[in-house]
Swiss-Prot record:
InterPro entries: ConA-like_dom_sf, GH16, Glycosyl_Hydrlase_16. The active site is at E237, E242. This is Probable glycosidase C21B10.07. It comes from Schizosaccharomyces pombe (strain 972 / ATCC 24843) (Fission yeast). Its main location: membrane. It is a single-pass membrane protein. It is an enzyme of class 3 (hydrolase).
């Protein structure tokens, strides 16, 4: 081992001292201190940013991984269950289509049925008729009972029996004419004497032909030629000739039990329908029945009488009930010859087909009636005043006999045909 070199030791000592001095300046120099601090902060910030970027990258990577997993799951589902989804969709489509087809079918059936009902109409085929009963001349009254009863329509009237009617001069008959009238000579406080006749014979179906020269007319009057079944209204009622006060148009009306309607159906007729429910107790009907008014020709009242009257016809069969009126100058030759053929006539005034009314159920065997009442349920009250008639109906009828000289029936004949 040799002796240490003193020069080398001095250099070593100097370098150590210089280093120590530099370190001291770095530590205690404020400027260098701030610079160093900033460098530290910058380095720390850069580290945080790098860490944040790394976090975002990791998050994006995680999201991508999740999306890829979801996509892979859906793809797997599509690959694993395509038949199930298609099967389910086709079943759903089939069910919806089936429901729609059923609904369309039901709706079409309902509408089709309504249309079929609305358009359906009886053929009213031609019949060969034979005369079964004729009321005329001096034997006319022998076929009727005189109904000495209280008026069921609450009229201001006294219905007399046959003997009383004859004594008071209310009835008469010869080979050409049959007269039935109300008293037109005296005042009455309990009702004006009049007539109500009902046939002794029942009829079921047939052609009823009334040749009428004159019908009762004037304020307060309510005449009617009609048919009536037992157990009213279930047996039915057919008003062939009817009007009140100073009216000018005849009305043909059916009165029935529940279940006979003429609404929304095909009807072939020239008259005007007034009501469509024939049930006497239909809401707000007040026993109006289902009436048809004859708007043309002098079918009622003063004009009818001045025109020499005319012929009223009722055709009653299972398919329906129809009615005609012919002016005196327009009576078909087959009627006057005694061989009526309704199939050859013009359209009826009234048509009541069996579309919504079982004719044979609603109308039992019928009797024929003629009557003449006053005021009552129809001709009186507001109807009387609205016709322009004076005072109250009962007072006028009871105290003005001279106003009832036109209140009479003049009948040429009534014939009943059946097939």
């Amino acid at each position: 081992m040799g002796i240490p070199d003193s020069t080398t030791d001095s250099r070593h000592s100097l370098s150590s001292a210089a280093l120590s001095s530099a370190s001291f300046e770095n530590i205690y120099d404020p400027a260098r201190k701030n610079e160093s601090t900033n460098d530290v902060i910058d380095n720390h910030t850069d580290t945080e940013i790098d860490d944040h970027d790394n976090d975002h990258e990791n998050l994006d990577s995680n999201n991508n991984n999740e999306n890829n997993e979801a996509f892979n799951e859906k793809a797997a589902e599509k690959k694993l269950l395509p038949w199930y989804r298609r099967y389910f969709i086709w079943i759903l489509i089939f069910i919806v289509a089936l429901i729609c087809s059923v609904l369309i079918g039901v709706l079409g059936g309902v509408l089709g049925h309504r249309t079929a009902v609305r358009d359906r109409h009886p053929s009213y085929k031609a019949k060969t008729y034979s005369l079964v009963k004729e009321y005329k001349g001096t034997t006319f009254f022998d076929g009727f009972d005189f109904m000495n009863i209280t008026d069921p329509t609450h009229g201001f009237v006294q219905y007399l029996d046959r003997n009383s009617s004859a004594k008071l001069g209310l009835i008469s008959a010869n080979s050409s004419n049959v007269i039935m009238a109300a008293d037109s000579k005296h005042n009455y406080s309990s009702g004006r004497p009049s007539i109500r006749l009902q046939s002794t014979q029942y009829f079921e179906h047939g052609l009823f032909i009334l040749d009428l020269i004159h019908l009762p007319y004037g304020c307060g009057t309510w005449p009617a030629f009609w048919t009536l079944g037992d157990d009213w209204p279930n047996g039915g009622e057919i008003d062939i000739v009817e009007g009140v006060n100073v009216g000018t148009s005849n009305q043909v009306t059916l009165h029935t039990g529940d279940g006979c309607e003429m609404e929304d159906i095909k009807r072939v007729m020239t008259g005007t329908a007034l009501q469509t429910n024939c049930w006497v107790d239909a809401p707000n009907s007040y026993n109006a029945g289902c009436g048809v008014e004859n708007p043309s020709g002098p079918s009622y009242g003063e004009a009818f009488n001045k025109n020499g009257g005319g012929v009223f016809v009722l055709d009653w069969r299972s398919e329906g009930i129809r009615s005609w009126f012919f002016n005196r100058s327009e009576i078909p030759s087959d009627i006057t010859s005694g061989s009526p053929q309704p199939a050859k006539w013009s359209e009826p005034v009234a048509d009541f087909p069996d579309t919504k009314c079982d004719i044979d159920k609603m109308f039992s065997k019928q009797k024929i009636l003629f009557d003449l009442t006053f005021c009552g349920d129809w001709a009186g009250s507001s109807v009387y005043s609205s016709a322009g008639c004076p005072g109250s109906c009962n007072d006028f009828v009871g105290n003005n006999p001279h106003n009832f000289t036109e209140a009479y029936w003049n009948i040429k004949s009534l014939a009943v045909y059946q097939y």
